[in-house]
Structures are given as structure tokens and as C-alpha cells.
């Protein structure tokens, strides 16, 4: 159980951080007119009909785009939009081994005869030089949270991942850390409401800590009957 818990916390932290990042990215591509507003889909869509998919390949984020370099025209003269597509993986420096599946996916789409033109992007904290250069050669944007959204947002995402990834609340001044995270991410549409729920257990834990020094979060508790 302890082994599963140790594996679960970093995964939960990464998925939560990437969820906030997807909201920020969605807001950014909409506000900058890169995509057709209502066509955006993310991997968090519960409706299977709205899965982010292009040419039968799944991505974390997709949206139709009417940017001129991405447009195509049918024989009848009808406009065929291109697509903005993005995958992301936070939490470590990515090597070419990590990114090769994404590169292959993008090249496969480009090789298909009737596939739409795409603007490909990958977001990670850091890339190896080999991975960065190979992404550029493949026509993919190797982005980072800091380059896209600035240092404050990138720092807040790191703080969030660090906080949620801790099995025990060993960090000092967690309430201040949570407040700092919320302040830095306040301008991302939907992020504040999401974090109020996701960080609720941490806020409660800090309150309980007043009377009890030994506090753990994220543990699955069971009754004597084995019920969770």
C-alpha cells in the first residue's frame, strides 16, 4: 500500500498541474485567435464524441484553425481548416526517447494524403539538446510553460506539483504556499475553481494540524469492515 501511495502522489500531482496548464493553453490560443473558439477539445472531455483527435491520432489538446498557412481548399472551393494540436508532459527533462512517439505521430499525419495541415506543439519543463533539435527538424514547436506564460505561472505550476506530490505535509508555511499559487494562477479561466476543490484537503489538513502535529493527506482510509 505504501508503494502504491508513493507512486500515486507524483502522478496525481502531474495530472493536476497539466490540467491547469491545459486551461492556460486553451485560454491563450483562444485569446490570440490561433483557433476557432468553440472547436477546442482537451483530453479531459468526458464525452467520447469530443475526444481531441486528428487523423485518428489522439492528442492532449486539439482545435480547428483558420490561420492562412493551415488552410486548404476542396475542388469545389470549400475551405478546409487546419488544426492546432498539442501534447504535454511535465515533471522531468525530456530526451529524444520520450518525444519520439510524438514526433512519429506528427510525421505520420503529415504523410497522409488528405490529412489537414497542422500546427504541432509539445510542452515540457525542459528538453535535452538532441530532443530540442529533432523537434525543430520535424516542424514541431518545443514549448515550455515559462516561454509561453512567463516565470510566475511556471513557478506556480512547479509549486503546485511539489505540494500535491508530497505524501506528507512536510513543507513549512503551506497556507502561504497555497495562497501564492492561487494568486499567480488567478488569471487562468477556471483554474481557481478547480484548485479550490483539489487543494481543499490540504487546507483542511493545515487546520487540523493546529491540534495534531501528525497529519497526512491523500491516504485512502478504510473502516474495520474494509470499506473505504
Predicted features and spans:
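A generic secondary-structure micro-motif detector
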Residues: 120-122, 194
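Acidic-basic catalytic patches of nuclease active cores, encompassing PD-(D/E)XK
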Residues: 3-68, 180-226
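Short N-terminal signal/transit or membrane-insertion segments
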Residues: 2-15, 70-75, 163-174
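Conserved catalytic cores of phosphodiester-cleaving nucleases, focusing on short active-site segments
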Residues: 48-110, 208, 227-228
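Charged, structured surface patches that assemble and position nucleic-acid processing machinery
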Residues: 78-117, 124-184
Amino acid at each position: 500500500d505504501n508503494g502504491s501511495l508513493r507512486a500515486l502522489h507524483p502522478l496525481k500531482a502531474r495530472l493536476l498541474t497539466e490540467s491547469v496548464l491545459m486551461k492556460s493553453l486553451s485560454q491563450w490560443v483562444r485569446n490570440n485567435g490561433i483557433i476557432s473558439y468553440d472547436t477546442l477539445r482537451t483530453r479531459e472531455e468526458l464525452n467520447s464524441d469530443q475526444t481531441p483527435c486528428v487523423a485518428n491520432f489522439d492528442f492532449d489538446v486539439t482545435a480547428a484553425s483558420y490561420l492562412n498557412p493551415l488552410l486548404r481548399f476542396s475542388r469545389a472551393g470549400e475551405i478546409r481548416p487546419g488544426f492546432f494540436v498539442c501534447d504535454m508532459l511535465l515533471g522531468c527533462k525530456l530526451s529524444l526517447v520520450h518525444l519520439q512517439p510524438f514526433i512519429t505521430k506528427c510525421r505520420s499525419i503529415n504523410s497522409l494524403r488528405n490529412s489537414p495541415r497542422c500546427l504541432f506543439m509539445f510542452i515540457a519543463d525542459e528538453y535535452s539538446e538532441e530532443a530540442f533539435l529533432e523537434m525543430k527538424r520535424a516542424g514541431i514547436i518545443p514549448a515550455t510553460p515559462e516561454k509561453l506564460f512567463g516565470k510566475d505561472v511556471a513557478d506556480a505550476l512547479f509549486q503546485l506539483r511539489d505540494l500535491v506530490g508530497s505524501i506528507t505535509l512536510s513543507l513549512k508555511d503551506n497556507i502561504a504556499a497555497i495562497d501564492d499559487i492561487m494568486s499567480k494562477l488567478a488569471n487562468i479561466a477556471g483554474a481557481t475553481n478547480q484548485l479550490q476543490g483539489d487543494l481543499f484537503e490540504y487546507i483542511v489538513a493545515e487546520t487540523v494540524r493546529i491540534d495534531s502535529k501528525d497529519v497526512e493527506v491523500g491516504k485512502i482510509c478504510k473502516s474495520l469492515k474494509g470499506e473505504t
